[in-house]
């Protein structure tokens, strides 16, 4: 067996007994790795027990949202009972929460309201990215990299190359927390908030390079996310690409060489995100919509290679 999952409260009993028994019977350990998880706590950080009346049934959390059913839980707190409510959670959101909210060995608070508010939106954002990508032509050959990618496409592919590398390292080390956090951060921030906003105009103008870029990233993103949310990623990948993100034989490999130029582009990410945020803030301060033209904004020299895309994105005049 490759791994034995268990709670930390039975290390000196079941873990030691199992190791002793397997050694006596087979003269070798019964498993290679031990996954020692933390304990589920109530919203106030206390262990759940019948005597405290603070237990939350996991099945009721998993079923929250199924068939339109909402969830409600009365939990006894230190001072008074509180009513917790949620509308949509389900198994995929539950898995994402467990993978992303605590590192291995750490205790974790079980609060359905927080699970929904912090993680259902992550799935919604990834779903919306995939739905947005579905509007544009799917490449005939995902492995055929366009020869004249613009600076913005090269930048996001360089970012994604590092994501692929770091997530694979996490999976190999059974570091589910780190891998999931990396995917979450990329899929909810850099990709939609910055690159997609830069690329929308080109996508709507039938730019084949932009279409190749978004589909290549979405397809591989669903694959590396499938160990956490298999049903969610299977549905999206089957719908978009006619194949399951779960049914893969090899980990996705970046088609962009993760070398010096990729590092140089990634070093511009902070400047790029800061410039976008400052420009959006300037529009808000002037009472302008984000789609409105704006004067007096200068693109910094360090971002000169993105000038055409940033000018179109922010409607700079």
Residue ranges and their predicted role:
Residues 1-9, 80-83:
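A short glycine/serine-rich beta->alpha loop
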Residues 4-7, 112-113, 265:
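Active-site rim elements
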Residues 5-14, 212, 227:
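Short, conserved micro-motifs enriched in small and acidic residues
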Residues 16-24:
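Short Ser/Thr-interspersed hydrophobic loop/turn segments at strand-loop and sheet-helix junctions
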Residues 24-80, 85-91, 114-317:
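Feature 926 captures the class I aminoacyl-tRNA synthetase adenylation module centered on the KMSKS loop
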Residues 95-100:
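Structured mid-domain segments that build the active-site/substrate or prosthetic-cofactor binding neighborhood
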